[in-house]
From Swiss-Prot:
One of its GO terms (cellular component) is cytosol. Its EC number is 2.7.7.38. The lineage of its organism: Bacteria, Pseudomonadati, Pseudomonadota, Betaproteobacteria, Burkholderiales. The keyword Nucleotidyltransferase applies. It comes from Paraburkholderia xenovorans (strain LB400). This is 3-deoxy-manno-octulosonate cytidylyltransferase.
Length: 266
């Protein structure tokens, strides 16, 4: 169950989508049950209760696909290094007020839970002093703790992120050893309240999005290859909504696409 503020504030959902995917070319236009993937994502965003749903892309084909299914679409530059940069351009184009809440719904998440989208928006609205909100869930599988592709987050007493890392954090000094021969030999993780897996869903205040492009890339962001560390490096606080509902995975590879297509009967 997702725990968040029960009062849903007005918010805008933006679905950034780009065609230039190395592992899965033309990913936003991949057919899923008779509709392009980007449309499936936008539909989930609409189900979240967002006041407005926008598809943002540098590809006319993506914009045309979104508009053909009744969604508003906006053209963005092709040189954005991240989805956050693309959102920043959209925020600048629309001139949203500083307190407007904008949720980044990644364009390769056709199975995203609409309640989680709404949840991070509500969580940000309830988290004064934070410019960003995201989500996480407890880790119970030892293999996930030691998997660098699983991003971990450590929280403070108020549920604000202390750090995100691909490393196993926090390190259980008395339980872990530097190396194990195999996953089966790894110990049970510390209490689930301590070890959390980050979920790549973000809500932002428009004021932050306007300042984001001017923030210098940080050393820790480069080392970890985690763009959220740029905001933390520059002193921004990130509120974390903890959910016990493990989200379904997104689409990164042809195998992922086949799995999702099967769910939709493609």
């Amino acid at each position: 169950m997702t725990h968040a503020n029960t009062t849903t504030p007005p918010f805008i959902a933006v679905v950034p989508a780009r065609l230039a995917s190395t592992r899965l070319p033309n990913k936003p236009l991949a057919d899923i049950g008779g509709k392009p993937m980007v449309v499936r994502v936008a539909e989930r965003a609409r189900e979240s209760g967002a006041q407005q749903v926008l598809v943002a892309s540098d590809a006319q084909a993506v914009l045309d696909a979104a508009r053909a299914h009744g969604f508003e679409a906006v053209l963005t530059r092709a040189d954005h290094p991240s989805g956050t940069d693309r959102l920043a351009e959209v925020a600048a184009q629309f001139g949203w007020s500083d307190d407007t809440i904008v949720v980044n719904v990644q364009g390769d998440e056709p199975l995203i839970d609409p309640a989680l989208v709404c949840g991070v928006a509500s969580h940000l609205a309830a988290s004064g002093g934070c410019a960003i909100a995201t989500a996480a869930h407890p880790i119970t599988d030892p293999a996930e703790i030691f998997n660098p592709n699983v991003v971990k987050v450590v929280l403070d007493a108020r549920g604000v992120a202390l750090y995100f890392s691909r490393a196993p954090i926090p390190w259980a000094r008395d339980a872990y050893q530097p190396h194990w021969p195999n996953v089966a030999a790894m110990p049970t993780p510390p209490a689930p309240a301590v070890v959390h897996r980050h979920i790549g869903l973000y809500a932002y205040r428009a004021q932050f999005l306007r300042t984001y492009p001017s923030l210098a890339i940080s050393p820790i962001e480069q080392v970890e290859a985690l763009e959220q560390l740029r905001a933390m490096w520059h002193g921004e606080r990130i509120a974390v909504l903890v959910t016990h509902d493990v989200p379904l995975p997104g689409v990164d590879t042809p195998a992922d696409l086949a799995r999702v297509q099967a769910l939709f009967g493609s």
